[in-house]
Amino acid sequence: MLGWLVIPWNQIFTAACGCFLSDRNYIHMMESNLDALQKTMEELKNGRDDLLGRVSIEEDKGLQRLAQVNGWLSRVQIVESEFKDLLEAMSIETGRLCLLGYCSEDCISSYNYGEKVSKMLEEVKELLSKKDFRMVAQEIIHKVEKKLIQTTVGLDKLVEMAWSSLMNDEIGTLGLYGMGGVGKTTLLESLNNKFVELESEFDVVIWVVVSKDFQFEGIQDQILGRLRSDKEWERETESKKASLIYNNLERKKFVLLLDDLWSEVDMTKIGVPPPTRENGSKIVFTTRSTEVCKHMKADKQIKVACLSPDEAWELFRLTVGDIILRSHQDIPALARIVAAKCHGLPLALNVIGKAMSCKETIQEWSHAINVLNSAGHEFPGMEERILPILKFSYDSLKNGEIKLCFLYCSLFPEDSEIPKEKWIEYWICEGFINPNRYEDGGTNHGYDIIGLLVRAHLLIECELTDNVKMHDVIREMALWINSDFGKQQETICVKSGAHVRMIPNDINWEIVRTMSFTCTQIKKISCRSKCPNLSTLLILDNRLLVKISNRFFRFMPKLVVLDLSANLDLIKLPEEISNLGSLQYLNISLTGIKSLPVGLKKLRKLIYLNLEFTGVHGSLVGIAATLPNLQVLKFFYSCVYVDDILMKELQDLEHLKILTANVKDVTILERIQGDDRLASSIRSLCLEDMSTPRVILSTIALGGLQQLAILMCNISEIRIDWESKERRELSPTEILPSTGSPGFKQLSTVYINQLEGQRDLSWLLYAQNLKKLEVCWSPQIEEIINKEKGMNITKLHRDIVVPFGNLEDLALRQMADLTEICWNYRTLPNLRKSYINDCPKLPEDIFVPLLPEKSPSRFFFF
């Protein structure tokens, strides 16, 4: 009964005094603190929501939120939970207050409650003061980037040997050496992938391609690119980069994999700390020279030898295929002789095996043996066996034109991915293949040659693109042949990817026939040149190039191909370009050039002119009279627009087969589609700043359309005209549902930006081969494909069954009212990449069932 008396008197006294005398005044300030707390909590929640919005946008790009952001959000979550508890007790505690809030019926409880409110208020204020993060996310740096490795034979034992050596505490640096094409890179890739199993053992595994013409900064950039997600280091000096690398790696247990060393690399100059037993780090490199192993002070060297006869035969058999080997009883014996000529070199076995994979007669196999025996070129070192073997694949090409096309592919840097169409345009203008195009402007002959080169293993087809590239060893062989096996090296100057800062002084201008300066650090070209024999000049993708002097083009009477594309800061073409009377190919796309020199009109032999993605403006007045031989004219995404004057010029270009253009006037668009020859030449079309009730696009007239862009337009209706003139002339009783494909057969890319007047884009169903679609800043669009319209189209055209059946890449940005993509978007069978941003009415998990293991990637099509 007297249990209440157990409360210590001093506690009661302290609480009572706290009601009136405490500096903190927890009881008296309780109500005002509660009001302030509720307001600041609202601010905190708003701040949290804003931050989560920023984080969501960055995570949609594939970035990872910062730990400090996560920590702040976690603290907010805890405070929010505690605040809810306080609110639940608020009515009880405030109800106990008396004497105008200066006292309480239960001073101890009110004092404790008031103290919690006060402290929480301070904590919320502190959180609010820290809510403004400059950065909220960063790129995810994986410890190991797994490599895709082709099928191998005889490599497993070597992988285990190298791995065992690496796991030895006494070995910090491991050298893998062997001749070119023997599989050193594949071995290094296999080691790289084994580190996936030991992610917890090492902090980071870094892959660096060194190559023959390496620069220290190039190696540093690759290392820093793996270590840091920011790009602030890009403009630093070489010594500063070395310091950044050292300070980062010094704290880590790292693995550095260096592929293709041709000479010693000073790791100290790069900034890489030496691997020691104490730090547990490792360096592994591949090289063709044992001397490099010694200079690099490798703790152990492992030779990557050619395959044994049995292993070589197994690889060759797999490459040729059993169908060919069984096509004649004598072929297996002859095939073993051919395989033996490869001396167990995997690259040669693959290349020659691929070349022989379509030879079904013993005569062809016997001829192959004779050619291999007669190719007795002697070269020091690796070239003694590799180049003659590789040259066999070159010699086996059908004719001279295919060989010329192949050799041309060596003018770009190692592993450069080049569009097939670009190669073909080069070859046509160089005169390697027939310049007469088909009526649709295409040249199947060029694609056929590329197919032959790919099947011969001389070119590599790139995944998911229409590009091809050349293996670096094959490229070396091609350059060797191009220089007449090294006898006429002055006739060709290729500095692609060499990071040179100026045009070399040792060029023999009188003799040189081909020059290529690609991806260099050249800023100005000011030399005076006299090049009576120069026919090909490639100066492209030089990001620092700002000027080419007038005198550079003064005397190049035989120049046929001039490619200046992707020099972003090049703003002017020299007037002396008018001296290039033999020029047939001119590409200035992706440059800062805004006007064309008057002298361009003198280039009457020009058949290819590319002005895409430039600031070039005007109507190209007089182009038909001054450049009458043009077959290809491209000004897509430039400031040139087809108007009445240019329309007449284009119609007068009687040889024109390929056109990319921009149109602002709907009547001009109608006139283009009304001209069968002109319309069929359109490959890329940009409709810009067009305001009209209706736009009609004819799938018949625009049958060759590959890219369509619609920018800043107000169009109430986009109608697809899929009927031919013959079909329109039929009576209604004669018209049946379409059984053939009625749509744009070649349209693969559509980009829509700031389109008004459209609630849906159901007309896109007529682009059944669409691979890339980007729609942005078009707030009135509610659906990409409307179900009712879509069903009507599919009923009319029976071959349109699955909407977007070939779509691979999809980007939707800033679409406030977009609620749906299409009624059965989950059947998109080929979607591999999606990017959705600021589409609040679109379900957040819209593609989760489609891409369970893929993160959205940011990409742009143009």
From Swiss-Prot:
Which residues are involved in binding ATP? 178-185
InterPro entries reported for this sequence: Apaf_helical, LRR_dom_sf, LRR_R13L4/SHOC2-like, NB-ARC, P-loop_NTPase, Plant_NBS-LRR, WH-like_DNA-bd_sf
Q: Which UniProt keywords apply?
A: ATP-binding, Coiled coil, Leucine-rich repeat, Nucleotide-binding, Plant defense, Repeat
**Residue spans of the LRR repeats:** 511-532, 533-555, 558-580, 582-604
Residues forming coiled coils? 24-61
Q: Which Pfam families match?
A: LRR_14, NB-ARC, WH_DRP
Keyword hit for Membrane: no
Which GO terms fall under molecular function for this chain's record? ADP binding; ATP binding
Return one Gene Ontology term, BP aspect. defense response
NB-ARC domain location is: 135-438
Top-level taxon of origin:
Eukaryota
So what family is this one in? Answer: Belongs to the disease resistance NB-LRR family.
What is its biological role?
Probable disease resistance protein.
Domain remark text: The LRR repeats probably act as specificity determinant of pathogen recognition.
- Give the protein's recorded name: Probable disease resistance protein At5g43740
The species this protein was found in: Arabidopsis thaliana
- Organism lineage: Eukaryota, Viridiplantae, Streptophyta, Embryophyta, Tracheophyta
